């Protein structure tokens, strides 16, 4: 698995468009497209402080911008450029390495930025970079609650943080909590879980689990949400050790989703 390339491609393909069903595109052409799209974004939003806007003005450190910076850091890992690093660092530093709603937030949309903070910490280990996101996740780890990820997008926003902290600290508690939260969303939330093992796809949230049906009698699966879950599995598998207790479970879900998504792809 070309894990770094796949990781960046999954994220940036959300911007670039669909992937050919005939196999992975040429690496050079893929990289050329990623660089072109990212250069456009950085030029359009040259001021890293620019808030997100989609009818509602939101701070630029929530998920809407955080997922972009995840992709940027992945791109930087295979195609290093000083301006990529500076753009991410200045954004994180402007937000004081913190989250909307502070260190006690349980909202994965708030926590998403923490993935980038950890990536930047791994490049230059100033403890302040991860102090707040680690305090937030430690707070969650130390409570029995596991039902935070009530919509499929949250799996991508929050789950990789636990894997990254587990790798960074060597503490198993992060991987254990990650599995408890993932398996609850997968198997329990909404009565029987958000994952449909028969189809290999995720329902968006409890509003879309059976008996909900579309007018044509079919299940409703959100393409974006399934893309998030698929990306989360890739990012987690990059971080956890080969002997992690539930690694095979994550791989099996990734393979099931791969098969399902291939069937759904447009030509």
Stretches with model-predicted labels:
Residues 1-25:
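Bacterial Sec-dependent N-terminal signal peptides
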Residues 22-267:
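Glycan-recognition and catalytic cores of secretory/periplasmic carbohydrate-active enzymes
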